[in-house]
Amino acid sequence: MVIALIVIIIFLVCLDVIKPRGYPPGPVWLPVVGSYLWFRREKSRVGYYHLVWSSLSSRYGPVTGMRLGTDYIVVACGYDAIRDILLRDEFDGRPDGYFFRLRTFGKRMGVVFTDGPVWQEQRRFCMQHLRKLGLGSRSMEAHIEEEARDLVASLHRRSNGGLTAIPMHDVFDICVLNSLWAMLAGHRFDLDDQRLVDLLDIVHKCFRMIDPSGGLLNQMPPLRFIAPRHSGYTNLMTHLNRIWNFLRETIDDHRKSFNADNMRDLIDLFLREMETSKCQNNSSFEDLQLVSLCLDLFMAGSETTSNTLGFAVLYMLLYPQVQRRVQDELDRCVGTDRQPTLQDRRSLRYLEAVLMEIQRHATIAPSGIPHKALKNTVLMGHTIPKGTTVLVSMWSLHRDVQHWGDPEVFRPERFISGNGNIKQDDWFMPFGIGKRRCIGETLAKASLFLFFSTLLHNFSILPSSESPLPSLEGYDGVTLSPKPFSAKLIPRK
């Protein structure tokens, strides 16, 4: 009996380390944990998740495979593999697992980490009604312009004529959120609203806690019972509860003042849709879905744009000659008696190229959002089993030496053609491509342009004498975020 048990255990152990036939090459699998020990060692060595993917690619090629805990993980680097994934329907899924369900009450809800009919219905609802509420319209632009003016006024007060250094790494958080929140909840927040400052700090912490592949909670879910603190479960639940409570309060306020004849925002429209679809068995419009949708938009809608703008200020500190050239262009094309508008975008070509180069060089979402294989398929000659989590290294795309020549160099001119126009590049994908392309791209582009141009139109950004020049090395996580830094803002007029 004992011998039989030992034989069975040995058989199961051997079975556990056998890779699927044709699976992409990668590090050795161990029983139970798969490649996890190698993954953690490599992460400790290189410091960032996206550099782990680059390390894998340099050893095994553009498509590499691991198993982390129970999860199959495939990482794609380089243009051909990434484009193939983003444009093929069989890779349009999102990972399913304990972590991905934890944030949405144990179910597959929201719009970011769903697929199939639920995702199609919710994405269609969001796009249709956000457009009606102003996405991509003059009213959206007016909202952002108002936020930019308020930010400038706040910075004038806080900077004391340029004498006082201001923390700049998170200065855009609330004004960026306000541009979205006006459409989502019909409300804007004061820039000094301490509750929002604290909540957005929690959002930043959540993004830094999360591993792009899903992390320990997804790969080894029992760890939440064995080591709740070490696995991140305790902190994550604390943060999520704070955000859930805020979103529920917002939705409850809408319910109390709901008027079916006066649709104020996306939450109202969702509540109306819930009423009209009550009798439909397969409708995805329910209470928890509304909270989950708000969670997705609240977190993803502010994080990447705010981080990009934080890095933009950092680049202007480190490259003062670029800052001066942007300001010269603003003075020449906009003048001093008005603020920049989106209509100025065509004439502010160097500024536009600077924003593109910031997005390329910083690559705020270096691993994108994870995809999932919806069926057994093949990628560049390798077998990808159904259910495999697929990560695309946008960092490898934006830092490819053969394509960019000098990818480590910050050089906005690479996006300007010989005749002075903006040069589009297929390798530049800050918002992705395909069906899973970022739904907030229009708002994000407008926000980046208007906040960045308005800031440099009104201030010169100088380093603080009290602290050394900051580094471009940011915090790791699902997104990269700038580490705390301050700058002096000198009024230009």
Swiss-Prot record:
Coiled coil segments of this chain: none
EC number assigned by the record: 1.14.14.127
Pfam family, one: p450
Signal sequence range: 1-20
GO cellular component: cytoplasm; intracellular membrane-bounded organelle
GO molecular function: heme binding; iron ion binding; methyl farnesoate epoxidase activity; oxidoreductase activity, acting on paired donors, with incorporation or reduction of molecular oxygen, NAD(P)H as one donor, and incorporation of one atom of oxygen; steroid hydroxylase activity
Catalytic activity entry: methyl (2E,6E)-farnesoate + reduced [NADPH--hemoprotein reductase] + O2 = juvenile hormone III + oxidized [NADPH--hemoprotein reductase] + H2O + H(+)
Cofactor(s), names only, from the UniProt record: heme
EC primary class: oxidoreductase
Membrane spanning residue stretches: none
Keywords: Glycoprotein, Heme, Iron, Metal-binding, Monooxygenase, Oxidoreductase, Signal
Tissues and organs where the protein is expressed, per its UniProt entry: Specifically expressed in the corpora allata of at the time of maximal juvenile hormone production by the glands.
Glycosylated residue positions: N282, N458
Membership in a protein family: Belongs to the cytochrome P450 family.
Protein name: Methyl farnesoate epoxidase
The organism of origin for this protein: Diploptera punctata
Source lineage: Eukaryota, Metazoa, Ecdysozoa, Arthropoda, Hexapoda
